[in-house]
Amino acid sequence: MSSKQTQLKKGKQPSWIEIYLPKEVRPYAHLARLDKPIGSWLLAWPAFWSVALIADLGSLPKMLAIFGWWAVWIRGAGCTINDYFDRDFDKKVERTKSRPLASGAVSPAKGLWWLAFQLFIGLGVLYQFNILTLALAIVHVPFVFAYPLMKRITYWPQAFLGVMISWGALLGSSALKGSVVPSIAYPLYISSFFWTLVYDTIYAHQDKVDDAKAGIKSTALRFGDATKIWITWFGIGCIGALLLGGFIVNIGLPYYVFLAIATGQLIWQIFTVDLSSPMDCGKKFVSNQWFGAIIFTGILVGRLFP
């Protein structure tokens, strides 16, 4: 039975991958999660925030395109290495057992070749920048590789993910300024770190039952019934860092209006999410693309109307 037929049998609509891509490349597109762009958005937003705060309007579209390209391919590489390390675990989890490496649609060796290709394409686009930016991008890769292993050794893999996924805030600064400017990059990095702890803890609640059986650790299992208390504090850290960052660079008042809207979105997530419902956890997780977009818009408008 084809993947498209399987999805229809389960009542799911086939993604654009099944509709438009040749059969031979579909497993690789699924391995990179190309039909689920939320991960690319979450990796891209810290870079977009940094670029929006620094770039002149004329170069902004080009810079966003470059870092958007980087985010898609590096996120894809992250998904590939995650699935490579987790292929035996994924077979035991209902939500992940059909992934290409777990199901056997892609062999481990071919998965590693696909990983190398994605890294080459993702890092190659940054070659046009200064040596510091390229070096930071290369240093980032071991963090991408190590993240899947953190789930085996600590209940805080989400914190490690925060370190890794916030990297774009540093890259945006180094690409445009030639250095990591603390007043610009650090508040954005810290806010993204705490934001990651919020949304990925919510995400981890989708699989907490299967994860506990498989021996996979997460903040969802660590916090348990106290999850909302923990992620409320993380949310305060996120908004606090964004507030401080705005003050440091003396951004315009409209930024704070958008920050208030983003705060409302984050409060809505935290206080309405049903942590016992994998479906609701998934929806709240995906809604974070809008949190990132609101902050990005606020930075732009705050710069235009100081």
UniProtKB/Swiss-Prot annotation:
GO terms for biological process: isoprenoid biosynthetic process; ubiquinone biosynthetic process. Expressed only in roots. Disulfide bonds: none annotated. Its main location: endoplasmic reticulum. InterPro entries: HB_polyprenyltransferase-like, Prenyltransferase, UbiA_prenyltransferase, UbiA_prenylTrfase_CS, UbiA_sf. Pfam families: UbiA. PANTHER family: 4-HYDROXYBENZOATE POLYPRENYLTRANSFERASE, MITOCHONDRIAL, PRENYLTRANSFERASES. It is an enzyme of class 2 (transferase). GO terms for cellular component: endoplasmic reticulum membrane; mitochondrial inner membrane. GO terms for molecular function: 4-hydroxybenzoate geranyltransferase activity; prenyltransferase activity. This is 4-hydroxybenzoate geranyltransferase 2. PROSITE patterns: UBIA. Keywords: Endoplasmic reticulum, Magnesium, Membrane, Transferase, Transmembrane, Transmembrane helix. Induction: Up-regulated in the dark and by methyl jasmonate or oligogalacturonide. Down-regulated in the light and by ammonium or 2,4-dichlorophenoxyacetic acid (2,4-D). It comes from Lithospermum erythrorhizon. Prenyltransferase involved in the biosynthesis of shikonin, a naphthoquinone secondary metabolite. Could accept only geranyl diphosphate and not dimethylallyl diphosphate, farnesyl diphosphate, or geranylgeranyl diphosphate as substrate. It is a multi-pass membrane protein. The chain crosses the membrane at residues 38-58, 61-81, 119-139, 153-173, 178-198, 229-249, 251-271, 285-305. The N-terminus (1-130) is determinant for the chain length specificity. Region I (76-96) and region III (201-229) are involved in the recognition of both substrates in a coordinated manner. Belongs to the UbiA prenyltransferase family. The keyword Transmembrane applies. CDD domains: PT_UbiA_COQ2 (cd13959). Its cofactor is Mg(2+). It is found in: Endoplasmic reticulum membrane. It comes from the Eukaryota. The gene is PGT-2.
